[in-house]
A protein has these predicted regions:
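A compositional/biophysical signature of low hydrophobicity enriched in polar/charged and small residues
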Residues: 1-79
């Protein structure tokens, strides 16, 4: 399983709509509103065989109201 975090910058007034669309995606486990340069943070779990770039392009960038994204790939989770 691959874990990625996607920070999203939304059009003005669209963050809640974008968040609603994101949580409908099977791979998205959590969506947070955040402060700073980006509006939302999505935590996604992908199969090891899934191409991360294609996933972000087809499943994230396709949502209306997103202006920019920044994707971080997680290596290990420490608990």
């Amino acid at each position: 399983m691959q874990t990625i975090f996607v920070q999203l910058k939304c059009d003005l007034g669209k963050a809640y709509e974008v968040a609603g669309e994101l949580v409908e995606r099977d791979s998205v486990s959590e969506v947070y509103s955040i402060s700073g340069q980006y509006d939302l943070l999505a935590k996604c779990y992908l199969d090891n065989s899934e191409d991360i770039g294609r996933y972000v392009e087809s499943q994230i960038h396709s949502i209306a109201g997103i202006r920019d994204t920044h994707t971080t790939i997680a290596f290990n989770a420490f608990t």
